[in-house]
Amino acid sequence: MRWREPLDAVRVVRRSLRDAWDALVAIAPINLAWAGLGLTLVLLPPATAALFESMHELASGRSPGIRDYIGSVRRRLVDGWAWALWGAAGLTIVGVNVRLDPDPTDPREWVSAAVAVLGILFGVSLLYVWPFLFLQPDRGLVPAIRNSILATLAAPLFAIVLAVLLALVVAVGAVLIAPLVLVVPGLICLVASHAVTDRLRAWGRIPPRFSEEASD
């Protein structure tokens, strides 16, 4: 039921926080590697894609390793940049159409507000892309993007609450610098993986392979 979506989003974030805490020793070096590679800018998209992959491993019940992470960075160079360009294009369109100086008397403000909401949903769909790709790796990036959009539109309230909770996590991490570097980037990826599997489970569409892994 749609009214349960906010509670489901809270449950997903709570589970992700617990998993991240339990695996802190394993994910802290990976987050530091992501931060270091991201400084080059050129490697930021594939490093981010690889971070999603490592956190998907954690969400599947396996312990991610730094060596596997570095290997994933190499594999995700092209897909990582394709995803980054897709995200940059969408967020640019949103940014151009959202007014930063709202005027309540201007009827166009409703359009601007609607675009802002669509921008939030688009941002969440970007987080969903990689979990969908890892669940069905043989289908490629484009179907994963399509599925991420459909999943976001199918549960918009879940996505918006998830975005608000992630914003709070980032805000807390910004105050506590060490957690921001050591935990928050990977935590966001972990939340995305748990969110996708939570929605698929709610719709009865968990891939058989993932169901077997989750039960191990």
What are the roles of these predicted feature ranges?
Residues 1-111, 115, 126-216:
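Helix-coil boundary and N-terminal low-complexity module in membrane systems
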Residues 121-125:
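Faces of alpha-helical transmembrane segments in polytopic inner-membrane proteins
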